Amino acid sequence: SDLGLEKDDKKFMIGVVSRLTDQKGFDLIAYMMDELCQLDVQLVVLGTGEERYENMFRHFAWKYPGKVSANIFYSEAMSHKIYASCDAFLMPSLFEPCGLSQLMSLRYGTLPIVRETGGLKDTVIPYNEYDGTGTGFSFTNYNAHEMFYTIKYAMSVYYDKRRDRKSTRL
């Protein structure tokens, strides 16, 4: 694919389209990158920003070929390709007054995984395992382990639901 990852339906594909800055939660992602790459995931990143985050993603794309796709530029067309092809969309923002990316991911049927702040809290309804409602997954505290746990939880629900996907909004 254009993203430099082999097509693998068994891998949970997580997209990130963002300015690579602290505000957007990249210190949390940086802290968990090695653990994240031990999971059965593929991570596709698109964006530019702070040099340390640009270099971090380049490093992990080199370290985990086929798992991490680092696209350190911005392309509107590619952003739509990512929204359309990923299983989940990660936005662990420290603060996010409004946030458009989670709305785009919802429009494409890609599960948002967000931190409960500002516009993210207002627009993503957390999954409720008891009645199967919700539009995505969220975590409360600005904490890397909480984010990681939420990603793993989203993966397990996603695979459980994939069998009877037609019957649920998720």
PLM feature spans:
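Cofactor-binding loop segments of dinucleotide-utilizing enzymes, especially the Rossmann-like FAD-
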Residues: 19, 46-48, 73, 115-117, ...
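Catalytic binding pocket for nucleotide-activated donors in carbohydrate/polymer assembly enzymes
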Residues: 81-166
